Amino acid sequence: MSSKQISIVLLIVLSVTACIFSSNNKDEQAIAKKVANILDQMTLAEKVGQMTQIDMRLLDDPSDIKTYHIGSILSGGGAVPESNTPLGWLEMVNGFQKVAMENRLAIPLIYGVDAVHGHNNVLGATVFPHNLALGAANDADLVYRINKATATEVAATGIHWTFSPCITVPQDPRWGRFYEGFGQSTELVNGLTAAAVKGYQAQLSKTNGKQVAACAKHFIGDGATVWGTGTRVDGLHTYYIDRGDVQLDDKTLREMYLPPYETAIAADVKTIMVSFNSVRGEKCHGSKYLLNELLKDALGFKGFVVSDWAGIDEIPGDYKSDVINGVNAGIDMVMVPGIMEGQNQQHYKVFIQYLIEAVNEGSVSMARIDDAVSRILKVKLEIGLFDNPYIDDA
């Protein structure tokens, strides 16, 4: 190839790259403009509602979605529609969405589910091996194809968000959730993370351009807790290692557990879930250093941070201080999720009341609320929810 031909090829490559970069910039600018426009119209109550996630079983009434401007509904373990079929799920999610769209600003719900090895809550869905088995295969293309297939089935049931992939680096096989990770090697987990995220978030056919959002979890150190440091949770039981304390120094924690998150963020993961555990005695759900300074500032994460199931409840202090400390630490959406029999959890209406009070009292700044809601709206726009809030049953 002559120098002239090489120059032409380079010029074409640079032109295409510039076009893609320009297009991406325009998309980002357009979304940012839409977010700002919506945010300017929102009341404090509407903003707090967007930061609230409720389990579908724990809604007092579906009309509360409209009344309290709820931003997200989830199906926790065992939370299934009366007809546990793909059509049953689709009709349930579309029904909740219809109520949300009756709000004056018509901000759609983002519905979440633990589709962690296939769409495993739905009878008849394809079930794949857990991550530990996929880590043993160590085949990034296989992980991508499995997660894209899972996302296809998730989207077909009207759902927009899977609480996966789990990118922990588990060390102690006595931990009951060990199988959720790809393996004990940071290099192995890191090597499969991009494929896992991109598979879930691949553009799908037959969804009118709508995309499923992935959720990297659990930030951070959930596979490194020390045996005997587990948390006692009222209404549940005492854990020996789960929800325990990570006692690694900061350098080791960063070297072992940050690389997969850096990779997930580079792959444009839309959401990240906080871990139940503590790091050197401080609950991750209440750590401004971990969630704000490290995850958002240092790593540059631009999506939104979601708590785990009633995760803020385990921050020391009463529930109102839990709300204040969790949101100020950097949690954008709180999985409340509501009052469940036999568990000591708070009602979503209490969460909403306390967060509104905290803003009015100055304990949580409006800037923090606006940042959280902007991130949530941004993700909803990016995955196409505003354009196509429903999936039809075709």
Residue locations for each model-derived region?
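Bacterial Sec-dependent N-terminal signal peptides
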Residues: 1-28
